Curated annotation (Swiss-Prot):
PROSITE patterns: ACB_1 (PS00880), ACB_2 (PS51228). Pfam families: ACBP (PF00887). Transmembrane segments: none annotated. This is Acyl-CoA-binding protein homolog 1.
Length: 86
């Protein structure tokens, strides 16, 4: 079964176990790239560690087409469903 991007975004919130921080950052970056496109926002301040991590993860996806980011997001969500259950 292949999920749509919207279904994957909804399903990831129902995982039985919370993904690791690295997995959450990957999800965030692919979601933002798949919905917004390249990161053009200002980098958060040096004391905003969580914001900087999220910003950097998204910025690393720069140049990835929205469609490709959405496909990668769905694939990652499907892996997480297999790993953690939904």
């Amino acid at each position: 079964m292949t999920l749509s991007f919207d279904d994957a975004a909804a399903t990831v919130k129902t995982l039985k176990t919370s993904p690791s921080n690295d997995e959450l950052l990957k999800l965030y970056a692919l979601f933002k790239q798949g919905t917004v496109g390249d990161n053009t926002t200002d980098k958060p301040g040096m004391f905003d560690l969580k914001g900087k991590a999220k910003w950097s993860a998204w910025d690393e996806k720069k140049g990835l087409a929205k469609d490709d980011a959405q496909k990668a997001y769905v694939a990652l969500v499907e892996e997480l469903i297999a790993k953690y259950g939904a």
